Amino acid sequence: SSHNPGQSFTTGTTTTVVYTATDAFANVGQCAFTITVTATDTTPPVVTVSSSTITRQVEVGTPGVNVFFTEPTATDNSGQAILISRTNQPGDFFSVGQTIVTYTFQDPSGNPASGTVTINVIEVDTTPPVVTVPSTTITRQVEVGSSGVNVFYTEPTATDNSGQAILTSRTNQPGDFFPVGQTTVTYTFQDPSGNPASGTVTINVIEVDTTPPVVTVPSTTITRQVEVGSSGVNVFYTEPTATDNSGQAILTSRTNQPGDFFPVGQTTVTYTFSQDPSGNPASATVTINVIEVDTTPPVVTVPSTTITRQVEIGTPGVNVFYTEPTATDNSGIANLVSRTNQPGDFFPVGQTDVTYTFQDPSGNPSSGTVTINVVEVDTTSPVITVPSNTITREVELGTPGVNVFYTEPTATDNSGIANLVSRTNQPGDFFNVGQTVVTYTFQDPSGNPASGTVTINVVEVDTTPPQVFVTTGEVVRTAPFGSSGVNVFFTEPVAIDNSGTADLVSQTAQPGDFFPIGSTVVTYRYRDASGNEATGTFTVTVEEMVDTTPPTVTVSGGNIVRTVELGQSRLSVIYTEPTATDNSGEANLVSRTAQPGDLFPVGTTTVEYVYQDPAGNEGRGQFTVTVIAVDTTPPSVNCPNNVFQEVELGTSSAPVFFTEPTAFDISGQANLVTRTAAPGDSFPVGTTSVSYIFSDNSGNEAEPCTFTVTISAVDTTPPTVNCINNVAQTVQLGTGSTQVFFTEPTAFDISGQTSLVTRTSAPGDSFPVGTTSVTYIFTDASGNNAQPCTFNVVINAVDTTPPTVNCANNIAQTIELGSTSAVVNYAEPSATDISGTAFLVSRSSSPGDSFPIGSTTVTYIFSDQSGNEAPPCVFTVTIGTVDTMMPMFTSCPNNIVQSVELGVPGTVISWTTPTANDAAGIASIVSNLQPGSFFTVGESATVTYVATDNSGLTDNSCSFTVTVFAVDTTPPSVVCTNNVFQTVELGTNPVQVFYTEPTASDISGQANLVSRTNVPGDSFPVGTSTVTYVFADNSGNTADACSFTITVTAQDTTPPTVNCITNIVRTVELGTSSVQVFYNEPTASDLGQASLVSRTAQPGDNFPVGVNPVTYVFGDNSGNQADPCTFTITVNTQDTTPPTVTCISDITRVVELGTTSVGISYTEPTATDISGTATLDSRSHTPGQNFPVGSTVVSYFFSD
């Protein structure tokens, strides 16, 4: 080396030390480092503060101000003192209160020094209070002639930035008496700094007139009559008039006037008087009734005059629903008064007349008739017998179908005839594989159809097992020496089946499975959908490789480092010896350069262990043992005593200077590592712990030197008092004093503790009417007294008792029936008050007002001059009527004569119910017989009506007679036959047709067939023929002719017969996506013309790999479509190309002489295949494995 430890080096210089090492083969290595010796400066800078305290004033409520000042400066023995921090700077914003600004300087050796400037920002109050007036103008009304009124209002208040604004004067207060006219009330406030502020309230007292005019109505209701259909009439009447206490009442509006046109109905005419000198309004109404008189009967609408319903032959009748007749009337109302039947009633076979009678409110009647015809018909379909609903036949797989013979369905009918009109197939037809539904349709002579079906199932049966293809042959793989086997990948056998599907049901192994060393037989088993099975087998052989792998040596502890005390030359070292493992299971130690417990010199020694396996492969392990001489003794520290210092209470911190700790070390050098504070630093109020830590050049650290700096605060500031506003409270007039509760003033002190020294009153004390001054004085724990807190308690006496009211009793009065209102006079309610004055505020009616029939509520409200309102005085005025007039019939029916059909025993007779009028209203109109009663042929009955009004008075002057006689005018009722439809096979003409003949009935009991154009069993040509029947009764009444049609249709109903083809299979090379396929197309034959309707593919089309269904559909000229012919074209792929392997080049590595093996990493070979997948079956080695010195062959095997 160029230098030795312990050698002397010059201050202020940097020296490079070089170590050189040489081995036995003259290989050289070097280590170099530098040693720098520096002189240390420990004297801090000197700080100069030009002005230690600066004071600025701001307005009360201002948060602070920007302050400019001369900054402290510093000098140092090094000639350089750098400002490293300051808590504020000139021009910064400073909040109200005291702020300490600290400046810290440092010399180039890192010695710090501090100086402080105290900034005091003080609030000064020059702002007057802010006065709030809830309402600047207050208006009160008094009766004309009153001199004034006591007025209550919410007083103005004031706020101030000091938190206290005191009321010093007011020219009036709430509850004072204010004369008629305008009075200005002034309030003056002042804050603790003497700044004044004022606010005013204007009181307006106004005289008003509140009595409305009195209106007189000569006649409240006027009635006029007009003809029905008239829109109205001009009406003349005497108009209402009005008087007022002012001597003047003006008519300001009226909704109509005498001579105006009034429409039919009730019209209310309103007269409004107002605009007396005070503008008080009053209203009155006149009711104009215009009444129509009606003599026109309702108009009846019958939606359907004749309704026909059919019933099964032998059924007596049926319940019939229909839309009922309706009626309209010029009055807007037409009431149904009778009906002989209603929707839903049971009607017998034959004809029934239903009569509806309507009547309007004036008793005018009107009738309408609905005829119900119930006809017997045959609607029962034939009954079909199917010998066998489902027939199943089996065919070989791939056969398109088979001819099937079966017993055909038959049919019977209540008419005795059931004809087969169509069938979709017949016995002996060819049926395709699958399910075919054969439909048979029968029809009776009345055209009622019925159908039956036979299902033909043709099923394919499969007995051929799948064919298994094993493409791999024997599979041979190698396994590393010592392993039990290897995972082997191979191409799996595949299977095909004539059904198109062969499922793998079991396998004894699969690609990637682990195979042991030796030969293993692998078996695959497949099964088709019919349960036919087939197997395929092959052999997998695994061979073991030769051992070339050296033992693996494990050095458990790694390199070893030990220390000795400075001056010792060697050390005995104990360690865990390296171990070795080998794939053969045996590794022997053949040599070692040292062993545990040997003496190792100061410095680094290399230790090597060598192991060998039975095949002679060697493995080596190395580690180093380093012995280092070190210094372990820490420095000795001289620590100072604790430091104590006082500041003003409220000051948060102060700079403190103290003597720093020193240290000594046996090496001659002790360095300050860290310190938590330095002389001149700012310390907060309280106790702060300061720590210094020293260390020597060997890193030995002494125990920390810790001492405390304690800053104590002294209090000289009086408490701050939160005074309260003046307290105001009202009492009942005449009360001398009252107990008052208020929130007491509070105080706050920077010491956190205040006490109440004295108070002149407390919450809950009794205060007299007037103003009482209350004073609170607070002090803190240091005896600093705050300024006294003074406020006023003001007690006001007011009147809160409402007047006492003498209310009137309820009033009842009667008038003649027909009058609508009456004028009522009464003694008005009165009121008294403790103040001596009570006045009427409002009333809903006055004596002499006109009140309508019924009960009217009258309300009076009184108040005193203090605004106390009494509860409302409420009573009722009730106007009743008296009736002395008997009712009078306004209409009565004439005598009634009615004819009925011969054989009918009688009929229901309806008439318009008589009407009657009465001023009191009609309570009831009753009679011995009602409209809609049944009257017998030959009978003459008297009908009498009695009317009674709501007062019990009666009139029985309405009576009339009802007479019924019989006449035959009705023709027979015919039940006609429905149109007949029959189908024959194409080419058949004519055909015999059977049908049910029309029938007729008559009320006389005899209906005769007069003529017919055909009879059942006649032959009819293809096309439509008309058949007519005519009936008459013995009285010569002929019924309308009964006509119906017979339509014979020739129809082709047989679909074409299709010759379908079998499924097609093609094979292509793997990677080919599709192939062109040619085939013979399906064909079809038909009784008429068979044609191809659609096909999903055709010969020569390209078909993709997979199963492709192809469908052909055939039809004939009659629209009969055969079942679709469907077959499949399957395109399979086959792979015969082995994978393409990308191998890597030979690898050569050079190792140190004596090394037996080395780990080698490389990029593994890869393979691709046209199938998209190439699988690694086995490999003799892996990247990173140890390879011995010499040549080793590495093998990789791939397959698809």
Curated annotation (Swiss-Prot):
One of its GO terms (cellular component) is extracellular region. Homooligomer in presence of calcium. GO terms for biological process: cell adhesion. Major constituent of the hyaline layer. The hyaline layer of echinoderm embryos is an extraembryonic matrix that functions as a substrate for cell adhesion through early development. The keyword Ion transport does not apply. Residues 1-39, 40-123, 124-207, 208-292, 293-376, 377-460, 461-544, 546-629, 630-713, 714-797, 798-881, 882-966, 967-1050, 1051-1133, 1134-1200 form the HYR domain. Keywords: Cell adhesion, Extracellular matrix, Glycoprotein, Repeat, Secreted. InterPro entries: HYR_dom. It comes from Strongylocentrotus purpuratus. It comes from the Eukaryota. It is found in: Secreted, Extracellular space, Extracellular matrix. This is Hyalin. Glycosylated.
